[in-house]
Each structure stands twice: as structure tokens, then as C-alpha cells.
């Protein structure tokens, strides 16, 4: 069987979502590890006054492509930016571009999607479902297409606790929903959305389930594969450890925790944190397309790209490693010392929200007003709480994903491909990965230099001293207000102090006797 780089040699690849987190990592990996690929057609829309070519050039000039630039300085020649709007009829392709794509494309990677959990249902259906259907219809016209690779999500069927590598029946017929949305106004769409999505937490998950069904039904005559990643995080190894460029998912929470803004989150310590590195998702997508292209299986291949069943990690462990990393390597100008409390208790959660989030933010905004600056902390806390609401479903529940197809795919790889396109998450060392992830948010999202660590540590020590001083003043105030005025309170206080003194004396005496 040919190797993965040999399979992609001379192939023309069509990629959607190349300006997104996953898409740009896939583009970099494809060009670096399969250098003899012929060309990559990238569907990109105009945005903010930038042409598709300018947007692609901006992506290619980023740090992500540093390694590729060193190894292959001429890689840009293989990338062809094509003006396309996935939300428009026929993808808004010109006749000339459409003809080129139809005649040349061998492999499609469909990575584009709206990943906003609070997206309006109409918009989510447009990009995640209708655009997928239009791409399938375009693929059916392609003369030399070998594989259609669709990137979905492991949570598409999160209404099930055990999820196999199959496409399940959709919650509603996608065609009927699309037809209904055409005559509904936005108010009606918003009103019926909660009932439509049912026990799924948001429109993103709901529409990704519909998209899988569209791929299965509309692409029945195509050679289709689906990769379902869970929570996509920073890179594990490639192109370098810890690369991340956005605040989405856990990244924003990690940063908020490192800044000392996030103090509590509704989560179960024992719930599985099914994080999967972005380079694992990319490697699996490239390998899955290779397998389907070489073997042409009869049925659609689905791969649950998850970690929980083979290398389990829990949210309590995530919290520990994130906080310990940011205490050793603090973010600049932290608001408070990093410390996060996980709780699944509703009342306790809202208590900590009031005491640890809203009260300090309110007091800090008063301080900003008094010093002539614009208050901002309450706005930050409000945005943080909205993000927490969307994520708490995933931090409070656990699922079991079948990974038989993933194991089969791993066994099909030759020794060299197993190294180059590593998908074996059993090798993932979580403590090291989380540390690199946190450092990645510092370096690549916040653009903080590691040379600034001494100053950041000094600032963290200053915050510690402020906290100690505040606690001391608080104890004195409590003493003056409550204990000093009550004989019973004083007696209890003296008893506790005496007990502590006796315990310490006993401890010192025991230590002396041992030596």
C-alpha cells in the first residue's frame, strides 16, 4: 500500500475553512509533510476590505508557517485562493473558477463551519448545512474526485451517552427545516429554536448533526469520510508544541484563569475533559482521506477523534495543571493570583460568582472611576459568564465514544506514517500538554514575550502581598466588630487560640524527640 505522502503526490486538493484554526493547521501540515502535492485550492471570501488572496497571504505570513517557510520557501506557489462565499447560491463561484475546480480536484477537505455556540439558527443552518449540501452537489460534478472528507464534531449526537462511528438519524429532515426557514421571520425562528434543538445544547451541535446526514444522503455516490473531533485544543507537537491563535473553547477560560479573573466554574471534577490536539485532528483527517482514497470502502467511514476512551483526563486535573502552570509562568498584568474552584452545586456556584467574580469586578470598576479611567471589569465578567454558560454542558457531562475505526486506521499506517501522521493519543502526556497549551495562549494569543516572566512573577508576588494585607485587615475588623464586643465570642476565640498553641507545642516536642 502506498504511503500517505505518496498518495497525495500530484493530487489537487480543495480546502474550505483555510482561514480558521483547524483549516490553517491542515494546510500547513499538508504542504510540509506531503511536499509533492500538486496544488491546494482554497475557498475564501472577501472580508473587511481584503481580497481572498490578501486574506490567504495574511494566514501564510503567520508564525504557524515558520517551519514550512524554512523547509520549503516556495510553498506559496501551490496555493490558489478562489473567491467563494459558502452562504451564497452555488457558493458564489465564477464560471471560470468552477470549471477549474470541477476539472482538477481530487480530494476535498470541508473544514468550514460556524463554531459560535450562540449562532442564530438560520445562520447556523446556512453555513453548516446548506453550504455543505452545495459543496456536495459541486463534488458530484467533479471528474476526478477520489475523496470527500467532512470535518464534523464528536458532540453531534451528544444526546446519546454512547456514540458509535455511524451516522445516526437526524433530529429533523434537513430539507424540511431549510424550506421552513425560508418563510419564517427571525422572531419566529428564535421562538422555535429551543424546541427544535431539544436536548442538544446549542445550534452548532444541532446543525452539525444535520450536516452529517446531508453528507451521507447527498453524497451516497461519493467516496465520503467523516472525522469527528471532540474539543479541539492547541497543538501537541506540530508544527511546534502549544500553537493556538484564538479564544475559542477552553483557550479563553485558560487565559481568564491565568489572569485571575476566572475564579469558579460549574463543572464536575470527575467529568472527562475530552480535549484533542489540533495536530491529531489534522493527522487523522489526512490519514482518513488516504485510507478512503486507496481502499475505497463500500460504506461511509466515520472516525471519532477523541481521547477519553484511550487516555482519559478529567476537568479537575485540567484545573490543577492550568493553575500550577500559570503560577510558575504568570501572564502579564494579572488581575488576581490564579485560583479556580470547580463545583457542580448550583447554590455554591452562584455564591462564588457573587463573591469571587462580581464583587471584585464591581470594586475594581469603582477604583477605575475614582482614578479617572473607564470601568471595564464588569463588562469582562459578563462576557466571561456568557462563555461559561455555553461550556458548562461539556464540563459537567461525560460521553463514551467508540473508536474502532480510529484503531483500524492506526494499524493501517506504515511505521514512517505513524511517526509523521501521529494519531496515537495514548502517547499524549497530559501535564506536559496542558503546560504547553497555557504557554501557547501566552505567546501566540496574548503575544507576551517569555522575557517578561520576571516582571510578571514580581507582579504576582505583589498581588499575594496585597491579599495577605487585605485578609489581615479583614480579621482585625471582624475582631473589632464582633469578638471584642462579646464575652462569649472572646472565650471561644481564646479557647481556639489556646488549642492551636498546645497543638503546635506538642508538634515541636514530638519533632525534638525524634532527633
Swiss-Prot record:
EC number annotated for this UniProt entry: 1.2.1.84
Molecular-function GO term, any one: oxidoreductase activity
This protein's GO CC annotations: peroxisomal membrane; peroxisome
Peroxisomal topological intervals: 484-515
Secretion signal span: none
Quaternary structure and partners: Interacts with PEX19; PEX19 mediates the targeting of FAR1 to peroxisomes.
Function: Catalyzes the reduction of saturated and unsaturated C16 or C18 fatty acyl-CoA to fatty alcohols. It plays an essential role in the production of ether lipids/plasmalogens which synthesis requires fatty alcohols. In parallel, it is also required for wax monoesters production since fatty alcohols also constitute a substrate for their synthesis.
This protein's name: Fatty acyl-CoA reductase 1
Gene source species: Homo sapiens (Human)
Gene for this chain: FAR1
Amino acid at each position: 500500500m502506498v504511503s500517505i505522502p505518496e498518495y497525495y503526490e500530484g493530487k489537487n486538493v480543495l480546502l474550505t475553512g483555510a482561514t480558521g484554526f483547524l483549516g490553517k493547521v491542515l494546510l500547513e501540515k499538508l504542504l510540509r509533510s506531503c511536499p509533492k502535492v500538486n496544488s491546494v485550492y482554497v475557498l475564501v471570501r472577501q472580508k473587511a476590505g481584503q481580497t481572498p488572496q490578501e486574506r490567504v497571504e495574511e494566514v501564510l505570513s503567520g508564525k504557524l508557517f515558520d517551519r514550512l517557510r524554512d523547509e520549503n520557501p516556495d510553498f506559496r506557489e501551490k496555493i490558489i485562493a478562489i473567491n467563494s462565499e459558502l452562504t451564497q447560491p452555488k457558493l458564489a463561484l465564477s464560471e471560470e473558477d468552477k470549471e477549474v475546480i470541477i476539472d482538477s480536484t481530487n480530494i476535498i477537505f470541508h473544514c468550514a463551519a460556524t463554531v459560535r455556540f450562540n449562532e442564530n439558527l438560520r445562520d447556523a443552518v446556512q453555513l453548516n448545512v446548506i453550504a455543505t449540501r452545495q459543496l456536495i452537489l459541486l463534488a458530484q460534478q467533479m471528474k476526478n474526485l477520489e475523496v470527500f472528507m467532512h470535518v464534523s464534531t464528536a458532540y453531534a449526537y451528544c444526546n446519546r451517552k454512547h456514540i458509535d462511528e455511524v451516522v445516526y438519524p437526524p433530529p429533523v429532515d434537513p430539507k424540511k427545516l431549510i424550506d421552513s426557514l425560508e418563510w419564517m421571520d427571525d422572531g419566529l425562528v428564535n421562538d422555535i429554536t429551543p424546541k427544535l434543538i431539544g436536548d442538544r445544547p446549542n445550534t452548532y451541535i444541532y446543525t452539525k448533526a444535520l450536516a452529517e446526514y446531508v453528507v451521507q444522503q447527498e453524497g451516497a455516490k461519493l467516496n465520503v469520510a467523516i472525522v469527528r473531533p471532540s474539543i479541539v485544543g492547541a497543538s501537541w507537537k506540530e508544527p511546534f508544541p502549544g500553537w493556538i491563535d484564538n479564544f475559542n473553547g477552553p483557550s479563553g477560560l485558560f487565559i481568564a484563569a491565568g489572569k485571575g479573573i476566572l475564579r469558579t466554574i460549574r463543572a464536575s471534577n470527575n467529568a472527562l475533559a475530552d480535549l484533542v490536539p489540533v495536530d491529531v485532528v489534522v493527522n487523522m483527517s489526512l490519514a482518513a482521506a488516504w485510507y478512503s482514497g486507496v481502499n475505497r470502502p463500500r460504506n461511509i467511514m466515520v472516525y471519532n477523534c477523541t481521547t477519553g476512551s484511550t487516555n482519559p483526563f478529567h476537568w479537575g486535573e485540567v484545573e490543577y495543571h492550568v493553575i500550577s502552570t500559570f503560577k510558575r509562568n504568570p501572564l502579564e498584568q494579572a488581575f488576581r493570583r490564579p485560583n479556580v474552584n470547580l463545583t457542580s452545586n448550583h447554590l455554591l456556584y452562584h455564591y462564588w460568582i457573587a463573591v469571587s467574580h462580581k464583587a471584585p469586578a464591581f470594586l475594581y470598576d469603582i477604583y477605575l472611576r475614582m482614578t479617572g479611567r473607564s470601568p471595564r471589569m464588569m463588562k469582562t465578567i459578563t462576557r466571561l459568564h456568557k462563555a461559561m454558560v455555553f461550556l458548562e454542558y461539556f464540563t459537567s457531562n461525560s460521553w463514551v465514544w467508540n473508536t474502532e475505526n480510529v484503531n483500524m486506521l492506526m494499524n493501517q499506517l506504515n511505521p514512517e506514517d505513524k511517526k509523521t501522521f501521529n494519531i496515537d493519543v495514548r502517547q499524549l502526556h497530559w501535564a506536559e500538554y496542558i503546560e504547553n497549551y497555557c504557554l501557547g495562549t501566552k505567546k501566540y494569543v496574548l503575544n507576551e514575550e517569555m522575557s517578561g516572566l520576571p516582571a510578571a512573577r514580581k507582579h504576582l508576588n505583589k498581588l499575594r502581598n496585597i491579599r495577605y494585607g487585605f485578609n489581615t485587615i479583614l480579621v482585625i475588623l471582624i475582631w473589632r466588630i464582633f469578638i471584642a464586643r462579646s464575652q462569649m465570642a472572646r472565650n471561644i476565640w481564646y479557647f481556639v487560640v489556646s488549642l492551636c498553641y498546645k497543638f503546635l507545642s506538642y508538634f515541636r516536642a514530638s519533632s525534638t524527640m525524634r532527633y
